[in-house]
Regions:
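Flavin-dependent oxidoreductase catalytic cores
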Residues: 1-224
Length: 224
């Protein structure tokens, strides 16, 4: 067990924008990595707001990782090209977004029931070895076993870490986190694993850390 557990600042769409991240870093600090809300393609182009949000000159935090969401490697590659243009050497791939309008098009957690599509999408990590990739995901869309079926694919990839939110996509943010499902994935995951979900106070961090001492870190959203 690490003496100090790394804390990752979760990307919350519509909330954790650049000014919020900058203010948090200036007033509180203590965060190992900040993540941008996902960048996506809209009508085959970028939203101006997304481009502004990831611009290095807009961000004054110690360590910022841009996140992308896409249903295909072609779209993911287009987004990654923007990150590279801006000088980033890391990228987080969103396989966790639960919002139905995106998920039904196999974005975010909507792609989790389709292992072949996940494998093709994450081929991005092999095509760009100069980029350090991570993945943020859920247990599945319909079934917590979906992540277990994806484990062999994920284990074969050069990922920096995986962040797991132990709910199903169809739950969105309702119901309880499935800690048994998280434990099952932890036991088959060969990458450093970060826990995300329902961490609202230091006691929650302590409880999760005691239950899962092998954790590589925690990602906190609303609790920050």
């Amino acid at each position: 067990m690490q003496d100090i557990l790394p804390i990752h600042f979760a990307p919350l769409q519509g909330y954790t924008e650049a000014f919020y991240r900058n203010a948090h870093a200036a007033c509180f600090g203590g965060i190992d990595s900040y993540y941008t809300p996902f960048v996506r393609l809209e009508k085959d182009g970028f939203r101006n707001k997304d481009v502004r949000e990831i611009a290095p000159e807009s961000n004054q935090v110690p360590h910022l990782v841009p996140q992308l969401i896409a249903p295909s490697i072609e779209k993911a590659e287009t987004i990654l090209s923007l990150f590279i243009e801006k000088g980033y050497k890391e990228a987080d791939i969103n396989l966790g977004c639960p919002f139905p309008l995106l998920a039904k098009r196999h974005n975010g957690s909507g792609i989790l029931p389709y292992p072949d599509e996940v494998k093709t999408l994450l081929g991005l990590t092999l095509k760009y070895p100069q980029i350090s990739f991570s993945v943020k995901m859920r247990l599945g869309w319909d079934n917590p076993d979906e992540c277990l079926q994806l484990a062999p694919i994920l284990n074969d990839l050069p990922l920096r870490h995986i962040t797991m939110h132990p709910r199903l996509g169809k739950q969105q943010y309702k119901g309880s986190v499935d800690l048994n499902g998280f434990d099952a994935f932890l036991n088959v995951c060969q990458h450093p694993l970060i826990y995300n979900g329902d961490i609202n106070c230091p006691d929650d961090v302590h409880r999760i850390r005691q239950q899962f001492p092998a954790l590589a870190g925690v990602m906190i959203g609303r609790g920050l």
